[in-house]
Amino acid sequence: MVFAAIPSPSRGVVHLGPVPLRAYALMIIIGIVVAVVVTGRRLRARGMDPALAGEIAYWAVPFGIVGARIYHVLSTPDAYFGEHGHVADVVKIWNGGLGIWGAIAGGALGAWLAARRLGISLALFADAAAPGIILAQAIGRWGNWFNQELYGKPTTLPWAVRIDPAHRADPGVATYQPTFLYEFLWNLVVAAILLLVDRRHRLGRGRLFALYVALYTFGRLWIEMLRIDTADEILGLRVNIWTSAIVCVGAVVALLVVRRPVDPDVSPQEQRALGLVQDRTRRQPTDAAGETAGETRTATRHDDATDGVDVNGADVDGADPSNVNGANVNGADPVNVNVNDADGAGAGAGEQPVAGAENGAAAVSSGRTRVERPPAT
């Protein structure tokens, strides 16, 4: 006996006068908007132009939709080219039928073309976009609920989804596993993990995107095993199960093999895009003898307007000499900046190297701080 069940919508389309508004398409549109907004905010946090999210989406979305439809048609050919299929239905995407793998492949191709035109690294953009993409997928899954499609095996669980007679796989069974809900919840979990990992460990170089792919495909594996809709099989397993397994393994390999390079190996463009240009150094208070009381910390900040080094709150720019703790910086391209210590002590005996801006080196001593910048190349 079923005590409760998730009801299905009576219809998946609403007519605004003569214009039909299909819920499936509406979910996709909402997902795209969310992805663009989230990605834009993450790009801004990285010091990049948030408008890049919309510019790349302008290419990625059409390519993704076409790729999703192509994958769906190729993975379920009988529905279109079989004995009872209709070739004309290939273009009717409003009736459902978009393969997520084709969407990812097509969207990646469109994003790559856009990134080349804009002159940015696709890997850097993909890391910023990963949480937004998985959120878009979560929202898009509700389109399956409106269309009463892609549900799982029959069940009497309280959270089962009730399917109308016209859409039932078995005329005698009314409730099924709500696979759309499982994938929605899993995608939210993946989004939370990505945001947490990115906050604590800036993976970089496309590794966060690889983590997104690995986590999503891992969840898709067991969700796919619950589905009972018609699909082609290889060795007794659905094609999507094989695809999920292969892509998951590939993503894990990429996550393990691709290492974040040390700063000298990162191009200036990528440093600016990720905010790796370190241009703000803050020292801990010193004791009476001039010894450094705490470790020197370097904050990461990206600034398109300046290429200088900020030492103790003052900017050092080759084109605009500044005064740093009482020491004037003269010249168009300063290399060494000597700063008298706050207690007035002279040069100390020892120096402690710390990380500087743009791979420059800084030495903190009891008497002076020296900031060295490498010659321009």
UniProtKB/Swiss-Prot annotation:
Amino acids binding a 1,2-diacyl-sn-glycero-3-phospho-(1'-sn-glycerol): R141
Pfam family for this entry, one: LGT
Localization of this protein: Cell membrane
Pathway given in the UniProt record: Protein modification; lipoprotein biosynthesis (diacylglyceryl transfer)
EC code: 2.5.1.145
Keyword Transmembrane helix: yes
Name under which the protein is recorded: Phosphatidylglycerol--prolipoprotein diacylglyceryl transferase
Name of the coding gene: lgt
